């Protein structure tokens, strides 16, 4: 008997193969072994894959479930007849009602490529047989639900149009009923209620909110001059020193009295300091007045003639002479 030569897997192929092998269910294999042996009456052997590899037991299985599905079963030990048996089994279970996505490929079983998919196919076949009424002592597979078609008359169909299902939600909670489109004018009353319009424009309905909280009433556009009194109330301010609460406060530090950069600053406040009666002379020839101006000698002489002598008097005699003879410096 010839065999296919296939080397070991490496890299991604080995990783995929190991991942598939990790999903293999050994308990399901034991249940499938017992079920197949009970249905066919044939022994699979200790190795599940080698026992089903030739396809003979599989063809006998589908013939028990659906007699006459496989006309000829090849019992040769060659590879091609064994692959033909597996192919005939796959065609037979498709005709039996198996879904294409539940069926394995021939190489998955023959080359031990994906025994997990082989196991899945046999479990689905057991469930399909149970659905069709083929029962055994081995409980394996899931019975498929049968289609139940119901027909309703026109009266029941129309009555169901007014019923809101649970999947549609509920209409007992808050909704957007009565909301207008963006930018549309909103009325202060409900026209559908056929009620009269409000007496004035100050009537605010509950849908419009409340006017008891903070609002932007009286706020001006940026850069617009703000008055310190209400023009709508025709009230005149008492004086220009009245500052409303919206204008801030004048009880803290400010830049009032600050001069332009580079100008001289006065050392007194004319509102609180009285003018001095006598000038203050710093250099003897010039002085500084109360307002920071300089006082010349002529001004001082005109104001105080008795105290001004014009020039300094020399009280020391000039009849002596200095002599440095005989003195070495």
UniProtKB/Swiss-Prot annotation:
SUPFAM superfamilies cross-referenced by the UniProt entry: Calponin-homology domain, CH-domain (SSF47576)
Tissue expression summary: Expressed in both non-smooth muscle tissues as well as smooth muscle tissues.
Entry's Gene Ontology cellular component terms: actin cytoskeleton; adherens junction; cytosol; focal adhesion
Gene Ontology terms, MF aspect: actin filament binding; cadherin binding involved in cell-cell adhesion; calmodulin binding
Calponin-like repeats: 164-189, 204-229, 243-268
Pfam families according to UniProt: Calponin, CH
Calponin-homology (CH) domain segment(s): 26-130
Residue ranges of the region described as Disordered: 279-329
Modified residues (N6-acetyllysine): 23
Stretches with biased composition (Basic and acidic residues): 306-318
Modified positions (Phosphoserine) in chain numbering: 323
Membrane-spanning ranges: none
Keywords from the named record: Acetylation, Actin-binding, Calmodulin-binding, Methylation, Phosphoprotein, Repeat
Residue numbers bearing the N6-methyllysine modification: 158
GO biological process: actin filament organization; actomyosin structure organization; epithelial cell differentiation
Alphabetized InterPro entries for the sequence: Calponin-like, Calponin/LIMCH1, Calponin_repeat, CH_dom, CH_dom_sf, SM22_calponin
Family designation: Belongs to the calponin family.
General function of this protein: Thin filament-associated protein that is implicated in the regulation and modulation of smooth muscle contraction. It is capable of binding to actin, calmodulin and tropomyosin. The interaction of calponin with actin inhibits the actomyosin Mg-ATPase activity.
Family matches, as PANTHER family: CALPONIN, MUSCLE-SPECIFIC PROTEIN 20
Name of this chain's protein: Calponin-3
Species assigned in the record: Homo sapiens (Human)
């Amino acid at each position: 008997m010839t065999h296919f030569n296939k080397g070991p897997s490496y890299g991604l192929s080995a990783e995929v193969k190991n991942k598939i092998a990790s999903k293999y269910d050994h308990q399901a294999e034991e249940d499938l072994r017992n079920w197949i042996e009970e249905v066919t009456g044939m022994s699979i052997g200790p190795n599940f894959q080698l026992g089903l590899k030739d396809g003979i037991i599989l063809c006998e299985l589908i013939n028990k479930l659906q007699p006459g599905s496989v006309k000829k079963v090849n019992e040769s030990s060659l590879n091609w007849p064994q692959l033909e048996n597996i192919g005939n089994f796959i065609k037979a279970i498709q005709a039996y009602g198996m879904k294409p996505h539940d069926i394995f490929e021939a190489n998955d079983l023959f080359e031990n490529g994906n025994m997990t998919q082989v196991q899945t196919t046999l479990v689905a076949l057991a469930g399909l047989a149970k659905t069709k009424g083929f029962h055994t002592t081995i409980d394996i597979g899931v019975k498929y639900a049968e289609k139940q078609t119901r027909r309703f008359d026109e009266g029941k169909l129309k009555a169901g149009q007014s019923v809101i299902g649970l999947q549609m939600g509920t209409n007992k909670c808050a909704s957007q009923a009565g909301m207008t489109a963006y930018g549309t004018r909103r009325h202060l009353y409900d026209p559908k209620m056929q009620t009269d319009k409000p007496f004035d424009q100050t009537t605010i309905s509950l849908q419009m909110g409340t006017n008891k909280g903070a609002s932007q009433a009286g706020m001006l556009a940026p850069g617009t001059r703000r008055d310190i009194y209400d023009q709508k109330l025709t009230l005149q301010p008492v004086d220009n020193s009245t500052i409303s609460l919206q204008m801030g406060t004048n009880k803290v530090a400010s830049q009032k009295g600050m001069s332009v950069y580079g100008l001289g600053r006065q050392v007194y406040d004319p509102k609180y300091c009285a003018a001095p009666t006598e000038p203050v002379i710093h250099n003897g020839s010039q002085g500084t007045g109360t307002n920071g101006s300089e006082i010349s000698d002529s001004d001082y002489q005109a104001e105080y003639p008795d105290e001004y002598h014009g020039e300094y008097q020399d009280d020391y005699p000039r009849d002596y002479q200095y002599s440095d003879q005989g003195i070495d410096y």
